[in-house]
């Protein structure tokens, strides 16, 4: 639906327009800081899963314009996957009103997906209706040392099979990269000593569980134990 844009200027605001716990959606303006959206969802007992290092300063509009991925993309997808509807100012100075919380919409062209990731070249996103999810009851995280990328791929395959949808994070980092961080920022240090600190590859593995802390721990330890026995992982540092 197109309607004329009234006024000669557009101001992108930062309000939360609506939060629907029945449909698990939140409608926010593009100037909203990502962290503020996360907190609004948390206050309603829900999770908005997009998370990245700049979440205290980046805006939802920027996340949408770049189709940001974040740390939990394995489970929840990119920003495009988290979006149900948009409000956009077009190049003609009109507002395209596609702010809908409809889960299944197979009518016509999907302009929403064209605008997301276009970095403002097709229009300026001014608001969005986003998906919310149940908050996890417990989570487990481990930093692992590995000898090769092949081992990392096999570990990821085992984690997917063992955790299913509960696998929320898997980040692979080279040892050279982490050593460079330590050199440039002497106040930082690796959590491993000796030969383990010189490992060629590190992986960060995360599980989020909807049942209980005990259930999360058991699943996590089972998959990780099997990976260690198979020689995929050399050393692990676990936080539960």
Question: Each PLM stretch: what is its role?
Answer:
Residues 1-12, 238-239:
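Single conserved hydrophobic/aromatic residue that forms the stacking wall/gate
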Residues 8-9, 67-68, 186-188:
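Short, hinge-like loop/turn segments at secondary-structure boundaries
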Residues 6, 22, 138, 198-199:
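Residue-level preference for short coil/turn positions at secondary-structure junctions
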Residues 13, 119, 208-210:
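Short loop segments at secondary-structure junctions
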Residues 15-169:
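FAD-binding subdomain of flavoenzyme oxidoreductases
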Residues 33, 239-240:
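Ser/Thr-glycine-rich phosphate-binding loops at phosphate-binding pockets of nucleotides
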Residues 130-134, 140-238:
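C-terminal substrate-recognition/cap domain of FAD-linked oxidoreductases
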């Amino acid at each position: 639906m197109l309607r004329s844009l009234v006024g000669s200027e557009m101001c992108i605001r930062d309000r939360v327009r609506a939060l629907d716990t029945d449909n698990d959606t939140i409608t926010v303006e593009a100037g909203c800081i990502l962290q503020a959206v996360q907190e609004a969802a948390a206050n309603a007992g829900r999770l908005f899963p997009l998370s990245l290092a700049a979440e205290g300063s980046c805006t939802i509009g920027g996340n949408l314009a770049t189709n940001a991925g974040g740390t939990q993309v394995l489970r929840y997808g990119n920003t495009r996957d988290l979006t149900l509807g948009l409000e956009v100012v077009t190049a003609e100075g009109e507002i395209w009103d596609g702010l809908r919380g409809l889960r299944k919409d197979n009518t016509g062209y999907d302009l929403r997906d064209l605008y997301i990731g276009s970095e403002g070249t097709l229009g300026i996103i001014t608001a969005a209706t986003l998906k919310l999810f149940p908050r996890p009851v417990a989570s487990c995280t481990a930093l692992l040392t590995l000898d090769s990328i092949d081992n990392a791929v096999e570990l990821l395959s085992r984690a997917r099979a063992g955790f299913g949808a509960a696998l929320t994070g898997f980040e692979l980092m080279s040892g050279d990269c982490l050593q460079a961080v330590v050199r440039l920022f002497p106040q930082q240090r690796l959590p491993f000593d000796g030969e383990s600190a010189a490992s060629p590859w590190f992986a960060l593995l995360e599980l989020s569980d909807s049942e209980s802390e005990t259930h999360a721990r058991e699943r996590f330890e089972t998959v990780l134990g099997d990976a260690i026995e198979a020689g995929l992982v050399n050393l692990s540092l676990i936080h539960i």
